[in-house]
Amino acid sequence: MNETQIQRETRQVVEDVLEKTNLKQGALFVLGLSSSEVLGGQIGKESSQEIGELIVETILGILGSRGIHLAVQGCEHVNRALVVERQVAEQFGLEIVSVHPTLHAGGSGQLAAFKFMQDPVEVEFIKAHAGLDIGDTAIGMHVKHVQVPIRPILREIGHAHVTALASRPKLIGGARAHYPQDAIRKS
């Protein structure tokens, strides 16, 4: 698999998702990543530290330039805990948990986050404003209600299926209620 192509596809997808979700500075963005799926393998079976680092470093650069915080979801072997900067955990009142990821418990994305973040910690849950799922890792539990599916410009990064989610406030009220225009769907 060509690393330049993976980096280019990652950049394209993330920039497209950010444009479609209209995220503001200070927002939380969750990443679910299966490097095995990117390489054409089965999730959890062919993890690649190099691919994890390539993708996470690329995404951190894009989000960091916009003031958006990254949370990297781990696999079920760490109960889908997430790596965030300690400052983010404190700012959002997130409970820090004790686990250090490995390639096969947490995954390559979490290891990369521990490498590239300034002061990484693991937290059990978040309510992100949006997120990107590379390889069908199931990020929905970490995106706040109401989740809105986003169709990325590319359907795959490498060989991994790609989906994205945004969120919007709940529409409450009855027949007389009026709602502001939805910045995500714009209709």
Swiss-Prot record:
Family annotation (SUPFAM superfamilies): TTHA0583/YokD-like
Tree of life domain: Bacteria
Alphabetical list of InterPro entries matching this protein: Antibiotic_NAT-like (IPR028345), DUF436 (IPR006340)
Gene3D superfamilies per the UniProt record, alphabetical: Hypothetical protein TT1679
HAMAP family associated with the record: UPF0340
Similarity comment: Belongs to the UPF0340 family.
Protein name (database record): UPF0340 protein SPT_0687
Organism: Streptococcus pneumoniae (strain Taiwan19F-14)
